[in-house]
Amino acid sequence: MSEKQVPIIAFNQVDLSFGDTHVLNNVDLEIEAGKFYTLLGPSGSGKSTILKLISGQLTADSGDISFEGQRVNDVPAEKRKVNTVFQNYALFPNMNVFDNVAFGPTLKGMNKTEIKNKVKEMLNLVKLSDFVDREIDELSGGQQQRVAIARALANDPEVLLLDEPLSALDYKLRKSMQYELREIQQRLGITFVFVTHDQEEALAMSDWIFVMNDGVIQQNGSPEDIYDEPINHFVADFIGESNIVDGIMKEDYVVHFVGKDFENVDAGMRPNERVEVVLRPEDLDLTSIENGKLVVTIEDQSFRGDYYEITARDDDGNEWQVQATNSAIIGARVGLTFDPEDIHIMRFNESEDDFDARLESYEDDDEI
């Protein structure tokens, strides 16, 4: 982040407990203006709690929450420049589409012409301009979600918070809404903070992702960085599918696993350090035993539409997931091949700061 740019939202050592349950553990985060952020994690990871702290629905036990450099811990929710879209939409069933979207501008004291123009602008934005007089119970789930977004944006928030807003929609509609939300955010240029447990949603929409588990931000970064360079077992397993096996980092760019040494592109670790090795299923190719870097036995497969999901096992008992364009024969022994850059190495208990510093150090060495 540029030194001159003050984050629109920042958490500094934020801690929160509910009774004996520690919900957030000394969370630090920074959110820049005008980007799409996602808080990603399983149920109970603390992601929705962060959203409620931003909106003012909850108060932290300790630590500072700031908005554009100003501490807001004690600022009430109604005075914060944020609006929230909820999973259940929270629309007013006794009001039609126009009145739902006009609710916020009316409370702000806009005149009738301003309200009409604002509602028209918001409904155009969410592609519901022809639904202005519809009753809420006449709308589909996707249409109700669009109305909820329009209503939240009609208040001109600097930050829009979205708490799992797509989880109740069917798969095709959810995919469509992913693109629409991203388009809306880019058109408006305001900050979106999106909460989800769905890693596909996070990867598809986000500029930046915070991966959470047990009240701790495990890793934050761009979708590409988090997918390609997971920091630990949890992130590697939660973001996409992963094959994870134990290994030993013999020296820079050489790792030992399943009884063999393999070239890779990682460095900056101690000689003979115990590590975990990650290979993504889509990076593995089936080949002949003679050409394979590993030899496995095919145990199972399922057709996934554009690929076969194949389960195999090596002679050491490690299970391997492979995505292949062609089917395999159950019980057959085959080879697996992959490239050095497909191997990702994870250290045990490496902090995110140390992880980033290590990557930067050996990437700089490669450029010399």
Curated annotation (Swiss-Prot):
Similarity-based family: Belongs to the ABC transporter superfamily. Spermidine/putrescine importer (TC 3.A.1.11.1) family.
Keywords assigned by UniProt, alphabetized: ATP-binding, Cell membrane, Membrane, Nucleotide-binding, Translocase, Transport
PANTHER family: SPERMIDINE/PUTRESCINE IMPORT ATP-BINDING PROTEIN POTA (PTHR42781), SPERMIDINE_PUTRESCINE IMPORT ATP-BINDING PROTEIN POTA (PTHR42781:SF4)
Protein name as it appears in the record: Spermidine/putrescine import ATP-binding protein PotA
Reaction it catalyzes: ATP + H2O + polyamine-[polyamine-binding protein]Side 1 = ADP + phosphate + polyamineSide 2 + [polyamine-binding protein]Side 1
Known EC number: 7.6.2.11
SMART domains the UniProt entry points to: AAA
Annotated Gene Ontology cellular component terms: ATP-binding cassette (ABC) transporter complex
Enzyme kind, highest EC tier: translocase
Assembly behavior: The complex is composed of two ATP-binding proteins (PotA), two transmembrane proteins (PotB and PotC) and a solute-binding protein (PotD).
Subcellular location per the Swiss-Prot or TrEMBL entry: Cell membrane
Any one GO molecular-function label of the UniProt entry: ATP hydrolysis activity
Topology versus the membrane: Peripheral membrane protein
Gene3D superfamilies per UniProt: 2.40.50.100, P-loop containing nucleotide triphosphate hydrolases
Function comment: Part of the ABC transporter complex PotABCD involved in spermidine/putrescine import. Responsible for energy coupling to the transport system.
Main location: membrane
